[in-house]
């Protein structure tokens, strides 16, 4: 029986590379996408034409109920999540002086709240099965900070604390 790995933000960049590596290691790979993402069909077809067999599910990782619904659907369709990779992330880079509350909230909700929302849905099952892995993709900016990335650095620092 192969294990199920779910990667948030798996449709590009680092997330896509993680999906490919997990597939190479024998995992059934599932990724999430933001509802309304017009690129998902083409991306999924391209990846599956290469033989990966990925599945993709809509999930607003910033919303606890959406995360729960997503994990419930994945569990029914593919199986329980054994590996969760919290990779979803965005930036809204600008000086703090120019940053709006909406800019702050968007980054904190996507980069930090999502870690709680997704982890909360899978942890009990992993504990019951006595096997599971949760990987939180951080950034050095969470430790050192970066000009123009107050919100991003704060979110990644929060993720670091959450993980510890």
Model-derived features: positions:
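Substrate-binding pocket helix/loop in short-chain dehydrogenase/reductase
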Residues: 95-96, 103-108
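Conserved glycine-rich Rossmann-like NAD(P)H-binding loop of the short-chain dehydrogenase/reductase
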Residues: 25-41
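Active-site helix of classical SDR
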Residues: 119, 155, 163
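The beta1-alpha1 cofactor-binding region of Rossmann-like NAD(H)/NADP(H)-dependent oxidoreductases
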Residues: 37-38, 58-69, 101
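Active-site loop immediately N-terminal to the catalytic Tyr-X3-Lys motif
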Residues: 97, 144-150
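Conserved glycine-rich cofactor-binding loop
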Residues: 11-12
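Residue(s) in the substrate-gating loop at a strand-loop-helix junction
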Residues: 139
